[in-house]
Design a protein with these regions (language model features):
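A beta-strand-loop signature enriched in Asp, Gly, Thr, and Trp
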Residues: 295-338
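Solvent-exposed loop and edge beta-strand segments that line ligand/cofactor-binding
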Residues: 71-98, 102, 135-155, 200-213, ...
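The feature captures the catalytic groove of carbohydrate-active enzymes
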Residues: 61, 65-68, 127-131, 135, ...
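Low-complexity, Ser/Thr/Pro/Gly-enriched N-terminal "stalk/linker" regions
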Residues: 25-142, 172-201, 237-238, 242, ...
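Bacterial N-terminal signal peptides that target proteins for export
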Residues: 2-12
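C-terminal motif of bacterial Sec signal peptides marking the signal peptidase cleavage site
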Residues: 19-22
Length: 408
């Protein structure tokens, strides 16, 4: 996520000024689908009757009219960076469209598949290990520079969601692409013994953050579930062990931002909503795929900690992080996805209440009532509105509202 950590602790308008400077089981039957099983999901409503389903569709209409390009890529935003495509923005839209296909709207499949084909432009074909670059021009030229663990890991996760809703050659292509992302993670030198292990954020190797490692853990788990290859299992266990040993803050019950610096490193104890949402999902996957229910408890405890520390009980929304009280659609609504996953596992509707109220706040404060796209930042009371409309924010609001529409 090329722009993400740069933006974490500086104002959004400053971040933008930085510009384009540069996500075999032994003795076990193989699975054909990945992720949390449908058997774990609770009572659903008809998606098409849900106001959230309608809003997800309206969000996609905004994307179609304003963010999608004639090349089948997605521009960064509608104003200041219309000629550039960010890797994780594009793959987030694939992730969003896969969610719509999963709940029954197959009209989204061509958008998903066309952008997947365009993503080849961002792949590092000159390196045997491959891996996605962070950015390119919207026509697919100019991909170069640093490569990011979270970009490649998120890409693999999104492709496995697309794998779940496709068949035949298309399905095989999504699986192979997810494997290629994992191959880059395993063989590009982004994991080393600095700080006792863990993945670097990117090829510059300036920090090791929770979210890069949590997304990698998700990808390895899901590939193990599908393929049964034990090296994916072993990688997931290594990442899990490093996260538990190095990134968990027992004082808050949350995962910290990152480790950087020389020697043993300096831990940065800011807590981010999406970091902890990613870890919640990773633990739920671990519980299911590794048949270890202690990780259900870990996920539930992490959800409780999120709702204690990262939830604003006055405005009923997740904060960006503990050092920044603003709200952003993509990074804050990731918390809703985690709450929906918790509900799917244990049936506690309180999780859905948090997911819904968080989305309701974003719809109230950050949605343009005319064009129905989302702005990128505001303060809790709605002031300080940053009116850029970023592609990734639209993608995540489409995706999470599609997920919620199964239940509310």
């Amino acid at each position: 996520m090329k722009t993400k950590l740069f933006q974490k602790l500086i104002p959004a308008y400053v971040m933008l000024a930085l510009g384009f400077a540069a996500c075999k089981k032994e003795n076990a039957a193989l699975h054909t689908k990945s992720g949390i099983t449908d058997a774990g999901e609770k009572v659903k409503t008809a998606s098409t009757s849900s106001a959230y389903y309608i809003k997800a569709g309206e969000t996609h209409n905004f994307v179609y009219g304003n963010i999608l390009t004639s090349y089948n890529s997605y521009r960064v935003n509608t104003t200041t960076s219309t000629g550039t495509a960010y890797e994780w923005y594009n793959v987030s839209q694939i992730y969003a469209d896969a969610a719509m296909v999963k709940i029954g709207n197959t009209a989204y499949a061509p958008y998903m598949n066309n952008t997947f084909a365009w993503m080849n432009n961002m792949w590092n074909g000159s390196n045997p290990n491959g891996g996605y670059f962070a950015a390119a021009n919207i026509n697919g030229t100019g991909a170069a520079g640093d490569q990011y663990v979270d970009d490649n890991a998120l890409s693999g996760v999104a492709y496995l969601d697309a794998y779940d809703v496709t068949t035949g050659t298309t399905q095989i292509n999504y699986l192979n692409a997810a494997k290629a992302c994992a191959n880059w993670l395993m063989n590009s030198g982004q994991w080393d013994n600095t700080y006792g292990g863990g993945f670097w954020w990117n090829t510059v190797k300036e920090s090791k953050p929770t979210q890069s490692n949590g997304l990698a853990m998700q990808l390895f788990l899901r590939l193990y579930q599908i393929t049964g290859q034990t090296f994916y299992r072993d990688w997931s266990v290594s990442v899990k062990n490093w996260l538990l040993a190095n990134m968990f803050d027992s004082a808050t019950g949350l995962y910290i931002w990152k480790i950087d610096g020389s020697g043993a490193g300096t831990k940065h104890f800011e807590k981010f909503t999406y970091d902890n949402a990613i870890m919640t999902e990773a633990f739920l996957l671990y519980a299911q795929i590794m048949a270890d229910n202690s990780f259900v408890t870990k996920a539930q405890n992490l959800g409780i900690a999120m709702n204690t520390t990262l939830w604003n009980s006055t405005y009923h929304v997740y904060r960006f992080n503990t050092a920044d009280g603003r709200v952003n659609p993509a990074w804050c609504v990731w918390g809703s996805q985690a709450m929906i996953r918790l509900y799917q596992r244990d049936g506690n509707t309180a999780w859905l209440d948090y997911a819904q109220q968080n989305i309701d706040y974003i719809n109230s404060k950050l949605r343009n009532a005319t064009n129905l796209g989302y702005y990128t930042f505001c303060n809790f009371d709605g002031s300080g509105l940053d009116t850029r409309q970023e592609g990734v924010d639209q993608a995540w609001m489409q995706r999470t509202q599609a997920l919620l529409s199964d239940y509310r």
